[in-house]
Amino acid sequence: GPNGAGKSTLMKIITCFIPPTKGTVNVEGYDIWEQSMEVRKRVGYLPEHNPLYLDMYVKEYLGFVAGIHHITGQEASKRIDEMIEMTGLGVEMHKKIGALSKGYRQRVGLAQAMIHNPSVLILDEPTSGLDPNQLIDIRGLIRDLGNEKSVLLSTHIMQEVEALCDKVIIINKGVVVANDNI
């Protein structure tokens, strides 16, 4: 949908960041209002404006996020290594996040969204502002993730919808105006 259509708001509702003004939302059978902790265990979220700690090192940040999800010790080390490999952060893992390009920051955001191995990924404009090479890499990663997880993404780029999506939902002023398979 267009700017202001309600895409980001809907994503914030699904991820339990804000409550709906009316209606209900369930994620894998869990109500976002009544069972928000269960929903949060199952959802990974990459917001449009990726809130990263710029003074932290990549590996340090992923360890911090793992701790938030109660992943510690060897399990945390294993997940961090898996996320670094999956997102192509190997050469950047010892750098401060503030020193990374936008493309690598997006990769850090994806890694943090997946650190707890959620079954649902919610990505709000995950390729906005990326250069052509970064765009290809991130789209490939999202496509691969879609083979094993449910991925909900918002975008204004129709080529991205065609490249990444099986289904499209168009929202305008908070109302679904189209909902169909591609």
Regions flagged by a language model, labelled:
Residues G23-D31, E38-V39:
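Conserved ABC transporter NBD signature motif
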Residues G63, G67, Q74-E92:
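Conserved ABC ATPase "signature" region
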Residues L121-D124:
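Catalytic Walker B motif of ABC-type/P-loop ATPase nucleotide-binding domains
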Residues T15:
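Helix-to-loop junction immediately C-terminal to a conserved catalytic motif
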Residues N179-D180:
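ABC ATPase "signature
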